[in-house]
Amino acid sequence: MKRNQWSKWIGVASLGLMLSALATPAAQALTVNAFVVKQVCLNGDFVRVTLSATVQPAGPAKYRWDFTNNGTFDTALSSSPTVTHTYPDERRFTARVRVMKANGQVAFDTVTFTTRRCSGGGG
């Protein structure tokens, strides 16, 4: 009889653990959106491009940028989502951002853009 009572308690405890695990929401997937903020002409045929990114869920994150999407990150980890890079004018580029949260979640995004025409220099 005592063995049967222990079996009931173990069964009830197991059921409670399973239900609490099912009720705990999973962490929200990390997403990132990369975009061009602005382009400013420099010295004739070059453009300073400001890139940035937003993440969901919002909160502290670390960012790395690959300015030409060639597989090599050009920046160190930074808490700032915004960077600037100089590109030749009138060319198409794809930049890639990698975002990492403190909990280890990682997300990537790319932004493709054509740099503005800057003949003769100035804004």
Where in the sequence are the language-model features?
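Extracellular/lumenal mature domains of secreted and surface-exposed proteins
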Residues: 3, 15, 20, 24-123
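Bacterial Sec-dependent N-terminal signal peptides
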Residues: 2-9
